[in-house]
């Protein structure tokens, strides 16, 4: 999935906070849920505007960047 289709940054949306593209859901919120021990399905139920494909692609991209920097 194209990274531009996963997360977008627009100064008019939440002051430029990175959000899942096409939503007003901050990408950080997914990480907060996972850090709290909540499964991906709980996040997706709470934020139905974020698709499973977007969430998984975000996590894959984040992992790829972390591993590339290691």
What is the meaning of each model-derived region?
Residues 2-41:
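A short, structured beta-strand/loop element
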Residues 25-70:
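Long, charge-rich, low-complexity alpha-helical segments
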């Amino acid at each position: 999935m194209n990274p531009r289709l996963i997360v977008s940054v627009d100064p008019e949306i939440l002051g430029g906070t990175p959000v899942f593209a096409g939503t007003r859901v901050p990408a950080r919120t997914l990480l907060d849920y996972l850090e709290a021990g909540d499964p991906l399905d709980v996040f997706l139920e709470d934020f139905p505007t974020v698709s499973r494909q977007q969430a998984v692609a975000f996590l894959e991209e984040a992992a790829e960047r972390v591993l590339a920097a290691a």
